[in-house]
Amino acid sequence: MQLALTRTRWTLAAAVAILAAFAVASGTLWQVQHRADKIAVAMTGGDIARAPDLIRRYGCAGCHTIPGIPGGDGQVGGPLQDIKRRVYVGGVAVNSPDNMIKWIVSPQTFSPRSAMPATGISETEARDVAAYLYSR
């Protein structure tokens, strides 16, 4: 009987420890993502929350793999994860928020033969999309 109680206590203690570790890890991940979001918004002046709808509306996911976008698994254009770590936008312009926004609005300005179409997205909308991409 005493052995059974000891096992139960150890099992409960282990479960509590695992849950506590999970809570700490989840909180840390949330803090990291929240910080990345704040930095991306400051860099671009965009609104991350509006980006998923814009990405769907303008068909970005039809060509690109985009993290966090359901169905964002296109294979025509380059994948859009870790944009903040890239040296170039579209392979031709130095990666900066201004260049990213200009590229999203009018890729042919940088590369006349680019396969990426001008979608008609506004500069404000491009800022939102850029903020989202830089935050991921």
Label each residue range with its predicted role:
Residues A15-I18, H34-V41, P70:
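Short low-complexity stretches enriched in small and charged residues
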Residues G71-R136:
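Extracytoplasmic electron-transfer domains, predominantly the class I c-type cytochrome c fold
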Residues R56-G62, P67, K84, E125:
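Short pre-active-site segment immediately N-terminal to redox-active cysteine/selenocysteine motifs
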Residues M1-L3, L80:
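Terminal targeting segments of Actinobacterial cell-envelope proteins
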Residues A49-D53, A61, G78:
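Internal, well-ordered alpha-helical scaffold/interface segments
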Residues Q31-R56:
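Electrostatic cytochrome c docking/interface patches
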